[in-house]
Design a protein with these regions (language model features):
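PAPS-dependent sulfotransferase catalytic domain
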Residues: 1-60, 64-70, 78-101
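C-terminal accessory extensions appended to soluble enzyme cores
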Residues: 104-140
Length: 140
């Protein structure tokens, strides 16, 4: 399972490690974060490093097992219930499992999917990454 949006992944890492907030919580959405931009940038770099490691692992797995033996699942596939159901159906087909049922989770996503809603100082964050390779992640 991998997240494609580096900024949102970094925010998840930041909230967990710097604020002690879990991504999912039974109590639901938590207040937005005011991020320290320097600390946040360290988590952006960590997200990039983790992404590189994941890509290297995926390449080795494909080389070893072949592409047909693997199914890639992205975090973004699980954002909403429709995506979860579709992904579970795809995985059931991949695994050749009939009658797989899916029950909605009791956990609610703790961080809003919109960066503007999740970060108090979003404008500062956007200014920091505008014009960089991360700019595209600000609006996804």
């Amino acid at each position: 399972l991998q997240r494609t949006n580096r900024i949102k992944h970094a925010l998840s890492l930041y909230r967990y490690h710097e604020e002690g907030k879990s991504q999912f919580d039974k109590s639901g959405v938590r207040p937005p974060s005011e991020v320290d931009l320097e600390v946040f940038h360290r988590w952006v770099k960590e997200s990039v490093a983790l992404h590189r490691q994941s890509k290297a692992f995926w390449k080795e797995a494909v080389d070893m097992l072949g592409r047909d033996a693997l199914a890639r699942v992205k975090y973004e596939d699980f954002i909403d219930e429709a995506g979860k159901v579709e992904t579970m159906e795809r995985l059931a087909g991949f695994l050749d499992i009939n009658g797989l049922s899916y029950a909605a989770s009791v956990f609610k996503k703790a961080t809003p999917d919109s960066l503007e809603a999740a970060v108090v100082n979003f404008d500062e964050l956007a200014d920091r990454y505008r014009g960089t390779k991360f700019a595209k992640f600000l609006t996804e």
